[in-house]
């Protein structure tokens, strides 16, 4: 019997493959994206220390009332918020880690909003 692997299992395999190549340093930390069925999360991570430097999501008090669901509008708001917080901490250059997701839709919208708000990647 052939069992088709779930989409999430395939995404995790892709993410592991990408993580072998994408590494965040103190000079250029990693901007990681995760999306659940209801929310979108973004973190800027220094992989040498294993610390999260900045984070933003649709669960943040600033976005909770404005951003409803994991859609493009919410992704745009999360991208702008993570860029604003990163620039406040002096982080301008990052490495984008799409988390195994296709660079399309919500992930692309978040990345474009972060770029427009001042992050370089």
UniProtKB/Swiss-Prot annotation:
CDD domains membership: Ribosomal_L18_L5e (cd00432)
Keyword rRNA processing set for record: no
Biological process terms in GO annotation: translation
Q: Which GO terms describe its molecular function?
A: 5S rRNA binding; structural constituent of ribosome
**GO cellular component, as recorded:** cytosolic large ribosomal subunit
Please give the InterPro entries that the UniProt record associates with this protein: Ribosomal_uL18_bac-type, Ribosomal_uL18_bac/euk
Does the UniProt entry include the keyword Phosphoprotein?
no
Gene3D superfamilies (alphabetical): 3.30.420.100
Keywords (alphabetical) are:
Ribonucleoprotein, Ribosomal protein, RNA-binding, rRNA-binding
Q: Which NCBIfam families match?
A: L18_bact
Q: How does it assemble?
A: Part of the 50S ribosomal subunit; part of the 5S rRNA/L5/L18/L25 subcomplex. Contacts the 5S and 23S rRNAs.
Family, per entry: Belongs to the universal ribosomal protein uL18 family.
- Please give the function described in this protein's UniProt entry: This is one of the proteins that bind and probably mediate the attachment of the 5S RNA into the large ribosomal subunit, where it forms part of the central protuberance.
Can you say what this protein is called? Answer: Large ribosomal subunit protein uL18
């Amino acid at each position: 019997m052939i069992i088709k692997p779930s989409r999430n299992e395939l995404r995790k395999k892709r993410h592991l493959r990408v993580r072998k190549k994408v590494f965040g340093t103190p000079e250029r930390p990693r901007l990681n994206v995760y999306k659940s069925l209801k929310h979108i999360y973004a973190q800027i991570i220094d992989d040498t220390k294993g610390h999260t430097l900045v984070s933003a999501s649709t669960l943040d008090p600033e976005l909770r009332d404005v951003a409803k669901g994991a859609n493009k509008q919410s992704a745009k708001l999360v991208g702008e918020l993570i860029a604003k917080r990163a620039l406040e901490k002096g982080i301008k250059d990052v490495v984008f880690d799409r988390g195994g997701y296709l660079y399309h839709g919500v992930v692309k919208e978040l990345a474009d909003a972060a770029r427009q708000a001042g992050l370089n990647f």
